[in-house]
């Protein structure tokens, strides 16, 4: 299964993601979830970004929080709402929201 997971909070959801075992995992960071892609604690990125997955962050939510695509970790791609629709319909079979 190809699964896209929306992460909308900065609290860690790693244990839930560990229970999901899709063939392909996409993590779409929205709302406060975009902080996973930009914040560093003690010089270290969020442990969420250690998963084997494709990572995306919604541009509008970055900008709302005073951030930009240049603030993102190197393994996270900035995307628009239209890109999210394309991902859901073309790349992934199921979606979940954490």
Task: Label each residue range with its predicted role.
Residues 1-4:
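Extreme N-terminal starter segment of soluble prokaryotic enzymes
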Residues 38-40, 65-69:
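Glycine-rich, charge-decorated loop segments at or immediately adjacent to ligand/cofactor-binding or catalytic sites
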Residues 25-31, 53-61:
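Short internal beta-strands
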Residues 11-13, 33-36, 64:
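Short acidic, S/G/P-rich loop/turn micro-motifs used as interaction or catalytic elements
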Residues 6-27:
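Histidine-anchored nucleotide/phosphate-binding helix
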Residues 19-23, 46-52:
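Short, conserved loop/helix-junction motifs that constitute active-site signature segments
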Residues 69-98:
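C-terminal structural segments of small proteins and small subunits
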Residues 33-50:
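N-terminal beta-loop-helix "entrance" segment that forms/cooperates
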């Amino acid at each position: 299964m190809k699964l896209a997971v929306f992460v909308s909070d900065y609290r860690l959801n790693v244990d839930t993601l560990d229970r999901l075992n899709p063939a392909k995992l996409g993590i779409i960071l929205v709302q406060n979830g975009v902080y996973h892609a930009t914040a560093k604690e003690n010089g270290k990125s969020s442990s969420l970004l250690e998963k084997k997955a494709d990572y995306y962050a919604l541009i509008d939510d970055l900008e709302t929080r005073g951030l930009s695509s240049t603030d993102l970790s190197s393994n996270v791609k900035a995307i628009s709402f239209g890109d999210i629709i394309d991902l859901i319909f073309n790349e992934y079979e199921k979606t979940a929201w954490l």
